[in-house]
Every structure is written in structure tokens, then in C-alpha cells.
Amino acid sequence: MDEFHRCGKEDSFWQQCFLYPLFFQEDLYAISHDHYLDVSSSSRPMEHLSSNDQLSFLTVKRLIGQIRQQNHSIVLFVNCDPNPLADRKKSFYSESVLEALTLVLEVPFSIWSKSSVEGMNECKSFRSIHSIFPFLEDKFPHSNSILDARIPYSIHPEILVRTFRRWIRDAPSLHPLRSVLYDYRNSPENLQRSIIVVPRVNTRFFLFLLNYYVCECESILFSRLKRSSHSRSLSHGSFPQRTHFHRSIKHIIIFSRRNSLKSIWSLKDPKIHYVRYGERPIIAIKGADLLVKKCRYYLLIFRQFYFHLWSEPYRVCSHQLSKNCSSSPGYFLRVRMNPLLVRTKTLDELFIPVLITNEMDPIVPIVPIIGLLATEKFCDISGRPISKLSWTSLTDDDILDRFDQIWRNLFHYYSGSFDRDGLYRIKYILLLSCAKTLACKHKSTIRVVRKELGPELFKKSFSKEREFDSLPFSSKAAARSQRERIWHSDIPQINPLANSWQKIQDLKIENLFDQ
């Protein structure tokens, strides 16, 4: 991939206009063949890989010729088996050709995405979850409303192919992509599956589609923005995963659906801030309610105008930060008033005015966390700890280390909240679940386990938190923890928990609107 990327840097025009000959390079299929073996070896025994499954250029011609009738929508992210093409054709070469197709398409996309970041000197972009929380802490207190949007999950395959034509001039190179999309869409497995956010099908190919689709939506959206600021960010190699980033917007022009050249609203200096966590964008706005309604309407017609997608109204929700909470990313986000006493002394009198400032107050979702722990069999639905039976075959140290890792991840991720009392209820559940698991393993009771291990039970488990001053082991540390907010650098470890909880929240909203 790096070799192809270097060739593309030397001559980007050749890269954009003549991608099709890359499909007939033996090195390309050798790379995809090795990559497929590396991925499949972890899930499939090597004896299942037949030596007769060989790649040939005839396979490419077959794939190009299988353009199906374009009368359905393609579901990009569905919960189905990891290898839909292999399930349907039972062939080894289909996955290798799909890997080769991904390698070819990644080259111009990587060059285009990096050049767009370097050329847009007026955009401020960060692509890390570590920048999201400080951004929310800095920008949300100065906003009064937010728009909670959701990226649509389905798109017609032909529309997706035509969007590729905007930056790939070599039309024949898109024939294999069109064939793969229609072939995947017409498979019977995909017509009966529910739509989810995280792609599980051919991780490299569908992650590329996800990154491209999000990048295309945002590039068109932010092409309408003027007078913004820009900050360079680190590149992500040959495959840019645009997972988390935010942008600061100072000017936006809203265009009519019927005539894109006629502006119907001009929002000057509205102080709009855009942040995206995974596939969930959030727009913070400081302005009147009319401004919020205009931006919400713009987001709804934007997808219909450019991608011919009908967006349900509940996919773009508006909230007032002073009254309601927003659920992202893994927090209940709200803004609270923080009174400050300012002592002013003159020669004659002493004045103590009260200044009211806004402050972001992320709330730990205790009840959803307990529900997720109940799903993983650490407790029941009411929060009563139970033993983890699937771990009783492990050693005592492994059991303690696993519980310790769960608590450490939870404590790190939610350390940004001032109110951490609910976290110690989670700690209590994990401690008793750990003790019950050990008691079940040794066929004894919790009292016997605690008597035999003594203080070693609590020294081995949940000991990592002692390294942090924010934990209230003393009154001084407790007072300091109420004034300080610490975002730890390893918070991405808890992303699966935040994503699972976010899916539950999205499902509740969809069910509410379906009723």
C-alpha cells in the first residue's frame, strides 16, 4: 500500500485517471492474498484454505461483468456474518479480489483526504477522541442549544458509485465496485438483517466505505462554510480513519433545495461548533431558536438534495443545554450555572458580587451501566451482584486482573465527571461479583474467601485507582476532586461500552417515533 501511495504522490493525475490498470498487477493480488490469509488465519483453520483456491485475471473479468440491475438500496452497515460473499459463492478469490479493490480505492482517497486537509486553511480539525472532551468542555458552556444528528446508514449503490466519480475519473475502475455493491445488496442475508452503526462485514472494505461516505458528506457540507479557522493534525498513514473530529464554524450559508445557487438564509457569525464521535455528529449553537430551526432544516434537506435520501425528523433532534441532556459520547451532557464570589475591596467598602458562569457538567449514566453489567452477567437487572460463572475456570490472579481492568477502564473514562458517587456503586457491584466468582470457583462462601485471602483480595483487585489523586481517599483529595476534572489519556479503552449504551439510546428514540 505504501508503494502505491508513493507512486500516487509522484503523479496524482495518473493516479486519478488510470486506476484500472492496477487491477491487472500481480503484486496487488499478492498483497491482498497475504492480507486475507493473515485475517482469515485468526478465524479459520489453515487446513480449511484449499490450495486449489488460486487467483487469476479471469476472476477480475467475471467480477467486472457482474453488474446487476440497479433498483434497490444498498445497506452498508448490517449485522450479518463476517463473509457474505464467501457464504454466497463459497469461493476464496472473491475475498481476495475485494481486498484488491479496497487497496486500489484507498490510494486516491488517501491522497485526496490529505490534500483536502492541507488545502483547507480555514478549517480547524482534530481526529482524536482526546480532543473531543476538552472541546466540549470549552465550547459547550458558551452554547445554548445543540443539534443531535445521525448519519444515515443506507444509500443507493449507484449514488455511491457516482460520488466516487467526483474524484476518480477512470470510469472502468468503478465497475468492480459497482458489481460488489449490487452483489452484496442482492444477497438474501442482507434483506432480513437489522441495521447497525459499526460495520462487521469485511472490516477493511466496509470501514473504507464508512470513511469515504462520512468524508464525502462532510466535504460537501463544509464547502459552504466561510471564514473558519484551521489547525493541522497528524496524518493517519495510507488508510485515514476519520473516526473522531470537530470543526469550528463561524459562517454558514443555507441553500434552497430547489435551487442550490440561490441562498435563502445567511447566518453571519452564529457561533456554530461541530463535533463528531464515531457516526454521531453534534452541532452546538449559540443563538436564537430561529437559528436552531434553520440549521436543523438545512441538515434535513442537505441529505435529500445531495444524496437523495429521506431523513426521518427524529434523526436530527434539537435540545436546550440548560433544560435537557444530550447523550454522547457515553455521558449525559448538560450545562449548569456555576456561581463565583468575587471579593472587591476599596478604601471605604468591601463588595462581594456574584458572577454566574456556565460550565459543562457531564453526568455518569449509572443506570445504563448497571444494565450493561447485567447483560454481561456481573449482576442482575436490579444491580445485585452475581458470580461470573464463565470465569470460574481461570486462575485467581486472572480473575482479579479482569475485574481490575474493568474498573480501571470505567474509572478512567468517567473521571471527567465531578459527581462520581455513582461510580462507587459500580465498584461495589464489581467487588462483590469478584468475591462471589472466587467463592463459586473454590466452592465456598464470600466470608471464607475473604478470610483466606484477607487484605490480598483488595490489594490485587482495584489497586490501580490508588495512583490517582482524584480518588477521595482523604478529605483533602476529596475536596480537590470536586474542583478538578481529569481526562485520562487511555479513555478509548471504554469505547465499546459507550457505543453499546449509545445504540440503546438510539433504539429507544426510534421506537418512540415509530409508535
UniProtKB/Swiss-Prot annotation:
Keywords for this protein: Chloroplast, mRNA processing, Plastid, RNA-binding, tRNA processing
Chloroplast listed as a keyword: yes
Protein's name in the database: Maturase K
UniProt GO MF annotations: RNA binding
Species: Pinus uncinata (Mountain pine)
Phylogenetic classification of the source organism: Eukaryota, Viridiplantae, Streptophyta, Embryophyta, Tracheophyta
Signal peptide: none
Gene that specifies this protein: matK
GO terms under biological process: mRNA processing; RNA splicing; tRNA processing
Family: Belongs to the intron maturase 2 family. MatK subfamily.
Record PANTHER family: MATURASE K (PTHR34811:SF1)
InterPro entries hit by this protein: Domain_X, Maturase_MatK, Maturase_MatK_N
Keyword RNA-binding attributed: yes
Subcellular location as annotated: Plastid, Chloroplast
Functional description taken from the UniProt entry: Usually encoded in the trnK tRNA gene intron. Probably assists in splicing its own and other chloroplast group II introns.
Annotated Gene Ontology cellular component terms: chloroplast
